[in-house]
Each structure stands twice: as C-alpha cells, then as structure tokens.
C-alpha cells in the first residue's frame, strides 16, 4: 500500500527538478494525481517505468516493537515489496530519495574540478536517459582497448560517474578509446569494471570463495554496447587467480565464481540475465541505511543532521540507543538483486561467440 505525504518546500523543489529534467530530455510523463512523487514514463521499448520520489523522513523503518509508538514507521520490506510486485508485472521502478538529490561531493573529475557536485542525482538522471534512449554518445566494445586503471584515475572516475563513488578493489579494468570519437579523445576512459574479494559474503564459504564485481560504471552521457562483455572476457582470460590480503595474510585464490550485486533501487538487473551474458539470478537481498536526524557526537560516533551512513558494527549499541531517542532513523530501500556465473561458464560462452 502506498503511503502519501504532504510535500515540504524542499520536496517541491526536488519534484520541480525531476519534472524540469524530464521536460528538457523530452521524456513524456504522467504525474500521479494522488500519490506524491510518482511519475510514470516508458523506456525505449515502450515498457513501463515508475519514478518514485521519496521524502525519507516520512518513511523510516518501523522500530515500534522495540522503542514504542514514537519509532513507528514502514515495514523493512516496504520498498522491496513495491519493486518486486512491479517487476513481476514488467514494470521497472526507479526510486529517488530526497537525500540522493541533495548529496554532494567535491570532485576532481576527469575533465574539470567541481565543488558541490550532485553525483547521485546526476547518475540517476543518466540512468533514466539510458532507459529512455536519450543517451547522447553510443559506443561499441570494438571502439576500445582494455587496460588496468590506476587507483588515482579510478577514484576520479568513480567519484564523478558511479552512484556510490569510489571503492577500492583488487583488479580495476577500464575501456580506453582507440581513437577520437563523439568529442572524446583517443585514450579517454569511458567505462570501468572492478573486481575484488567479498570478505563479508565469503565468511560462510572460506574454502570456495567467490569474486565480486564491485563497481560497474560508464561515463555520464555515454553508453557502451558490449562493454561489459569485453571487460568480463578480458578478466576471465587474464586473471585465473587474484592476490588478496597483505603481509603475512597475502595469498592467491582461484577465480571460480563471479557475483554481481545490482542496486535494485535504481538499476534494472534483468539485463544481467536476459542479455548475452545470461548471468544466473540468485535472488533478492534486503537493504537499508541510516540517517542522522540531529547532530551526533557520542561515544566516538560522529554525524551531522541529514547525513546518511551504512552499517557501523562497532557503534551498534550507540546507534540503537539513538534510534530509540529519535536522533537516528533507519531507512529501508529496494535492496539488491544478486546474479552469479562461474568463470568456466563465461569462458565457454565467450569461446562460442
């Protein structure tokens, strides 16, 4: 069941930004007459998409059983259930949270420095453009060579073009242009795929660990047809093992299985299983984050009002106490859709193609 809310001044500004963007891109939309923040559009194939703007303060996760009525909210699977229901009816949902539109970071991008860059909102807009066929620069895998990306260049790229920004990995691969095209220069980095060991996910399978595709990101305004296949093929052929750990714990592990956790709040993971890659769909995982509703400086935990943060196991007791006091709220999301494929299966498919 949808929960409606009365928009604040900030919400009205954000809704105007969404509508202005859709108008600028000439994307037809239908604005729902009763549910605030719900817009209906269609992708390039005519399939339905729902854009759902959310003011997170109206949708905290329910903690009333533990802390009483003052901590009442939506169930932990609220967004997940809406996305799953719509997916079962061939409707894609792209969630747009208020804090994603207000997020900023100072970035030294690949082409210029920018302060107060709204990376997450820019990536969401690019996701919508891609779905609706409004991407300006299309490339093919054959336009590129594959090379490892240095950490400095990777950080600049991900902090500009990836929704969650930079995260370290064991292997970083990039697509670099062979020659000038679409206003970009020979040697420009257009797409990256990074790989690493998932420590949390492998706790239950230390003797048969999987490798995670940690970041998959394309430069904003661009699309690379066949780009992911090209990067995966290069990885599978050239990296039968990965070196993980450091010091005395440094060792090699065989690359047997790859897993990709697709952000279900924004991305359409169906392409992972319906494309030529045909990854297996392993299921959905739930997700949530936390938000400070007040400035916090207690027991080593520091945060400012409105700031978003993820799990902090060392501060669990403090966080739970502050949730009970209403100074932190937990916010659910649509979770992740999980896909997997073994290296041998991928190599066989690449050889057949």
Predicted feature locations:
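Short, basic/aromatic recognition patches
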Residues: 140-142, 147-169
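A short acidic/basic microdomain associated with nuclease active sites
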Residues: 19-40, 258-263
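Conserved beta-hairpin
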Residues: 38-43, 158, 170-193
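Short beta-strand-loop-alpha-helix junction that forms the active-site gateway
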Residues: 35-36, 41-79, 197-201
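Acidic-basic catalytic patches of nuclease active cores, encompassing PD-(D/E)XK
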Residues: 1-31
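Conserved N-terminal entry element of GNAT/NAT acetyltransferase domains
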Residues: 2, 92-96, 106-113, 127-149
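Catalytic cores of nucleic-acid endonucleases
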Residues: 61-118
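Acyl-donor binding region in acyl/amide transferases
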Residues: 98-108, 112-123, 145-148, 169, ...
């Amino acid at each position: 069941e949808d929960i409606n809310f009365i928009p604040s001044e900030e919400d009205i500004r954000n809704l105007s930004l969404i509508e202005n963007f859709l108008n600028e891109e000439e994307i037809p939309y239908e604005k729902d007459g009763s549910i605030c923040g719900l817009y209906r559009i269609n992708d390039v194939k005519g399939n339905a998409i729902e854009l759902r703007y959310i003011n997170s303060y109206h949708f905290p996760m329910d903690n009333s059983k533990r802390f009483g009525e003052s901590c009442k909210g939506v169930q932990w699977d609220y967004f997940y259930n809406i996305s799953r229901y719509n997916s079962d009816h061939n409707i894609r949902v792209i969630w747009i949270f208020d804090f994603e539109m207000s997020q900023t970071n100072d970035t030294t991008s690949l082409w210029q420095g920018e302060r107060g860059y709204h990376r997450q909102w820019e990536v969401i807009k690019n996701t919508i453009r891609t779905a609706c066929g409004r991407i300006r620069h299309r490339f093919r895998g054959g336009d590129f060579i594959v090379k490892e990306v240095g950490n400095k260049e990777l950080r600049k790229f991900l902090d500009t073009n990836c929704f969650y920004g930079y995260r370290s990995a064991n292997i970083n691969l990039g697509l670099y242009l062979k020659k000038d095209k679409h206003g970009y220069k020979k040697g420009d980095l257009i797409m990256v795929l990074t790989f690493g060991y998932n420590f949390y996910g492998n706790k239950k399978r230390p003797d048969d660990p999987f490798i995670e595709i940690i970041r998959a990101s394309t430069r904003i305004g661009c699309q690379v047809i066949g780009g992911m296949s090209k990067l995966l093929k290069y990885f599978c052929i050239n990296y039968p093992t990965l070196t993980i750990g450091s010091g005395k714990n440094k060792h090699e592990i065989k690359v047997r299985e790859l897993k990709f956790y697709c952000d279900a709040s924004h991305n359409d993971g169906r392409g992972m299983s319906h494309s030529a890659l045909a990854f297996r769909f392993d299921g959905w995982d739930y997700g949530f984050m936390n938000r400070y509703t007040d400035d916090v400086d207690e027991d080593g935990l520091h945060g400012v009002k409105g700031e978003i943060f993820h799990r902090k196991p060392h501060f669990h007791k403090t966080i739970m106490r502050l949730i009970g006091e209403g100074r932190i709220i937990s916010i659910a999301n649509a979770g992740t859709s999980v896909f997997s494929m073994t290296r041998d299966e991928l190599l066989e498919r690449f050889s057949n193609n």
